């Protein structure tokens, strides 16, 4: 299994026979090198989105049309994109599980907000979500944009993820200290990868507080387009 950061909250996850592009905001992403776009997209099988905000949907429609990839996410958002943009999609909802190239992806709760920008104002796109991605003997908890929430308790107990990809840059999501607290209290991770940080000055620029708060856990600060093998 390989997890590759695309900057901000974007990832390329190669698991089982699937290559998932998660929240692929590439164009205009200060951390993503535009001249390496093909490297990020090569072999992708699905696009997995957590919610409707532009720094997460980003290049979703362009990539879906260019590569013929299905967009996977919460029903309201995927249905709206299908109707407006004519793309393929797999819409489901909290508690539902879909199998993507042998990987089992279950949608779970997050606490944030979700909308897309429209000419007349924000467009409702369902609610925000996270995912449990199971395959190759591992379970990844992809938090999506979220703060700490009590639901993490049963999510950790039921799904037992060993890898956490946690939004932890603060301001719009939990910060590094809160993410460390959530990981300690609700999960038993072997590996934690922070995201949604370093992109803008108002976000946290380092994961040191996360590392300090998780002794005994491997906290990996991702580098853009450098695969992490699990």
From Swiss-Prot:
GO molecular function: hydrolase activity
UniProt-listed InterPro entries: Metallo-B-lactamas (IPR001279), RibonucZ/Hydroxyglut_hydro (IPR036866), UPF0173 (IPR022877), UPF0173_UPF0282_UlaG_hydrolase (IPR050114)
Top-level taxon: Bacteria
Keywords from the named record: Hydrolase
Listed Pfam families: Lactamase_B_2
Keyword flag Transferase: no
SMART domains in the cross-refs: Lactamase_B (SM00849)
PANTHER family with a match to the protein in the record: UPF0173 METAL-DEPENDENT HYDROLASE MJ1163, UPF0173 METAL-DEPENDENT HYDROLASE MJ1163-RELATED
Protein family according to the UniProt entry: Belongs to the UPF0173 family.
Name of this chain's protein: UPF0173 metal-dependent hydrolase Rsph17029_0942
Species in which this protein is naturally found: Cereibacter sphaeroides (strain ATCC 17029 / ATH 2.4.9)
Classification lineage: Bacteria, Pseudomonadati, Pseudomonadota, Alphaproteobacteria, Rhodobacterales
